Structure formats: structure tokens, C-alpha cells
Swiss-Prot record:
This is Surfeit locus protein 1. Coiled coil: none annotated. GO terms for cellular component: mitochondrial inner membrane. It comes from Takifugu rubripes. The gene is surf1. The lineage of its organism: Eukaryota, Metazoa, Chordata, Craniata, Vertebrata. Keywords: Membrane, Mitochondrion, Mitochondrion inner membrane, Transmembrane, Transmembrane helix.
Amino acid sequence: SFLKWFLLLIPATTFGLGTWQVKRRQWKMELIDGLTKLTTAEPIPLPIDPAELSSLEYRRVKMRGKYDHSKELYILPRSPVDPEKEAREAGRLSSSGETGANVITPFHVTDLGITILVNRGYVPKKKIRPETRMKGQVEGEMEVVGVVRLTETRKPFVPNNDVERNHWHYRDLEAMCQVTGAEPIFVDADFSSTVPGGPIGGQTRVTLRNEHMQYIVTWYGLCAATSYMWFAKFIKKIKV
């Protein structure tokens, strides 16, 4: 009957959607892998052209200059990334359960003559105040290698940034630059830029929304359920 073959479209469609999600998941995993490889590629000199920077997120760059520790910003709460595992685990958090903050410091790039923002890395809660980690407040010109990051928009359930208290919950470059006077250029310093007593670098998380496995289970589950219902109703009742 028409109804019999019409209802067969339901398991056929859900099977097709499940298969499509399998392909989408593979594409997303390859994209994450590609971005992760950028974070370990040979660094290039930091470009100053905003148009060029906008296409370089997660690209490793290098620059020489000096930190201005008097204008530190704090993104919190943050858990530490395990630098040794980050490249292959695409952003998985460390299992220590410890929380603290990422220290964002203006950095004057000598050869470009501009000041940018550098995420020096993670400090535990008890070390957020700079006077508790004076050994790590390095002075003088140095080379920093890191990863270009772009501005963020506030995600659902993430609090608004509290500029007055210097509590930042997401990377709002426009607001951060208004406070510090820096250019809207942001770099996550890598683990090799860590200095004794200072923040732990290498806090870049390669994060892309990847919920395809949930959709795969959902669509294939619906396919199995509706296939069984169709078989029970239309096939078991006739002689094969």
C-alpha cells in the first residue's frame, strides 16, 4: 500500500542523516587536527596587517619586545592545559581539578613599534596577585613565541566581563585594548616561553563545537527503532 512505502521513508531518511553526520564528524576531526598542527608549526614573524591576522588564528608567531606588567589582565576561572598532551588531545583539560587564571600582559613589540596583548599563561588562584610571583615578572627585551588568537563573543551562561574588578571571563579584544592601550592583537605564549616563577605558557585550547557523535547515535537509533516498527507492522504479517 501507499502508507507502507511512505512510512519506509522514515527509517531511510534517518539512516541517511546518520551517515551524513558520520561524514561531518570526520570532516570536523580533520579540521581540528589541522588547527592543532598549526599550533606546532614553525613560527613566522608577527604580521601587523589586521587583514592578514584575521586569517591566522592558531598560527604560531614570534616577536621580540618587553612586557608591561603594570597593566596585567586576568581571565578567570581557568584550569591548566597540559602542554605535553594539548597538541594530540585538541583542548582536553588537565585532570588536576585546579583552577586559577590566565595572565594577559601588554607586550611592546620592538621592531613593529606597537603594543599587543600576550597571554603569558596559567597561574593558580593563590598566585594571581603579581606580588606573589615577582620572580616571574621578567624585565628587559626577550623573544616570545606563541599562537595568534582572535576576539571572542560571550557564550551562553558565561558571565559578563567585570572591567572594574579586572575579572575577564572571555577574550573581548576591543574592551581589553581600551583598558591597556594595546593594539587588538592577541597571542597565547607557548610553553617554551614560560619563565621560572612565572605563568605556565602553552594554554591554547583548540576548540570547535563537535557534537556529531550525539547526532550519529540519535539518527541511527531512530533508524533502528523505526525500521523494527515498520518490519513488525508490514512484514511479519505477510508470508515471505
